[in-house]
């Protein structure tokens, strides 16, 4: 299982999108009985609505000096999950309300989502936040929110006994082993 975690660690996953489908394709290679299912964006499921599909190709914050303080390609936790696209330059003061950190865990990068409220943001360690200088910042989020689907999978593995054991997990939280 550690080998699986290492293979899947860097895949950019959310509750929808290509990273989730890539993860399930990898798991299907390990367990061929795995069967995918999908539900279209906008579908009402009990008290919940399946959100739009979200895919990202790039996201970063870069100070005018060239120093990057968040880079989705290095750690996809840096981007608030479901961030809307943006490509602009802004001041430190305008950027700060869009940054999230955990002062009580100064070396950790938080995991933040925004499935239903259109917004953008970045997550960084509190130590990095405190090192950010005043000045201008290039802010890029190359993402797309579109009609798509929520994809999941299930498998029935027949064992030696008649009892059933259910294993359930999520794969939507990227780069975390203990969430």
Specify the residue positions occupied by each region the protein language model found.
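N-terminal hydrophobic/helix-forming segments and targeting peptides
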Residues: 1-179
